[in-house]
Amino acid sequence: MLRFKELYQQKIIENLQKNFSYKNKHEIPQIKKIVINMGVGEATADSKVINNAVNDLTLISGQKPVVTLARKSIATFKLRENMKIGCKVTLRKDRMYDFLERLVIVALPRVKEFRGFSYKSFDGKGNFTFGLKEQIVFPEINYDKIDTIRGMDITIVTSAKTDQESKFLLSGFNLPFYN
């Protein structure tokens, strides 16, 4: 059922062990969690917009997201403290592998003019962050039922100590990289 989890356990661990020669099996990098964040700037004007974003993120992730609140007021953005401005969901264990599989196999091939991810998206500690400009690349989202096209930020948090280990780990899951 979870092909990516089996792929990690059977092939990727073995390849990481060969290339980086870890002394302990607990040193081998793994994906800890995937965080999907959807910022909704229009929510300052219309509070109903946040409900549509929550519904979209629920369909995409299979888990109910948490609504994020503004930490402080910013007058130029017409933003008040504790105003709803987005939503996020944290995926772990089986749901994480399920989402990663749908992302790589179904969603990324549907992105227009997608060449791959840049290696510059790593943060120096083995975590990888990228953005998608539209939520309709996921098959769970019905194009006719959405109000506007929204983007999202996806962060893949790994236990890798370096970006090189993390690149090798994510390349094993067939995440496309260029340069």
Curated annotation (Swiss-Prot):
Keywords of the record: Ribonucleoprotein, Ribosomal protein, RNA-binding, rRNA-binding, tRNA-binding
GO terms of biological process kind: translation
Any one Pfam family match given in the protein's UniProt record, by short name: Ribosomal_L5
Transmembrane feature ranges: none
Database matches in SUPFAM superfamilies: RL5-like (SSF55282)
Any Gene Ontology CC annotation: ribonucleoprotein complex
Keyword Lipid biosynthesis set for record: no
GO molecular-function terms, A-Z: rRNA binding; structural constituent of ribosome; tRNA binding
Function: This is one of the proteins that bind and probably mediate the attachment of the 5S RNA into the large ribosomal subunit, where it forms part of the central protuberance. In the 70S ribosome it contacts protein S13 of the 30S subunit (bridge B1b), connecting the 2 subunits; this bridge is implicated in subunit movement. Contacts the P site tRNA; the 5S rRNA and some of its associated proteins might help stabilize positioning of ribosome-bound tRNAs.
Quaternary structure and interacting proteins, as annotated: Part of the 50S ribosomal subunit; part of the 5S rRNA/L5/L18/L25 subcomplex. Contacts the 5S rRNA and the P site tRNA. Forms a bridge to the 30S subunit in the 70S ribosome.
PANTHER family on file: 60S RIBOSOMAL PROTEIN L11-RELATED
Protein family: Belongs to the universal ribosomal protein uL5 family.
Protein name in UniProt: Large ribosomal subunit protein uL5
